[in-house]
Amino acid sequence: KGDPAEWMRDACYGEDTLEVSTAIAVGVVVAQPDYPYSKATQKEVIDIPIYGVTSKNRRFIAPQSVKMATMPDMDDDELVEREMWATAGDYLCVVTGTGRSIKQAAERAYKVVDDLHISDMIYRDDIGEKIEDELPTLQEHGYATECEYE
């Protein structure tokens, strides 16, 4: 939490001002075919508009192969051109959700993924599910003891 530059400066002077969140985070990779194999040509994966990025959900999206470009968009019933995100490769972004539990964090991440509209976008829809079965074993060994699935 806070400004990383400030807590790094404080650390240089022997002060520990780093505040760490105890929230659980889940990240969902949003890509285009044929990620992760990267056999698609640049022509096939660049300059595709990324719709649905808003000032509200932008802070949960870490852009990767993304650029700003003038793209077609609808304004009421009129076709207009505006500056927006467009694809610049096949690994587009990581959408992050945080919460008190793994399930809540995943639900929040997928809510933002659902806001995005990208032609042929692909993503896994099972992020965080496997840990439901594995978490008790990890906790028996002393790991993730404060973590909850639901």
What do these predicted regions represent?
Residues K1-P63:
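Active-site "cap" helix and flanking loop/linker of ATP-utilizing ligase/carboxylase catalytic domains
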Residues A5-R9, A106, Y110, G128:
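Predominant activation on well-ordered alpha-helical scaffold segments within soluble catalytic domains
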Residues T22-A25, G89-Y91, Y123:
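A generic structural signal for well-ordered coil/turn residues at beta-strand boundaries
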Residues V28-V29, Y91-G99:
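Short, well-ordered beta-strand elements within core beta-sheets of diverse protein domains
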Residues K39-V94:
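Generic long, charged, amphipathic alpha-helical segments
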Residues E81-E83, K111-I127:
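Short arginine-rich
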Residues G97-L116:
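Short, well-ordered alpha-helical segments
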Residues I127-E150:
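A cross-kingdom feature marking charged/low-complexity
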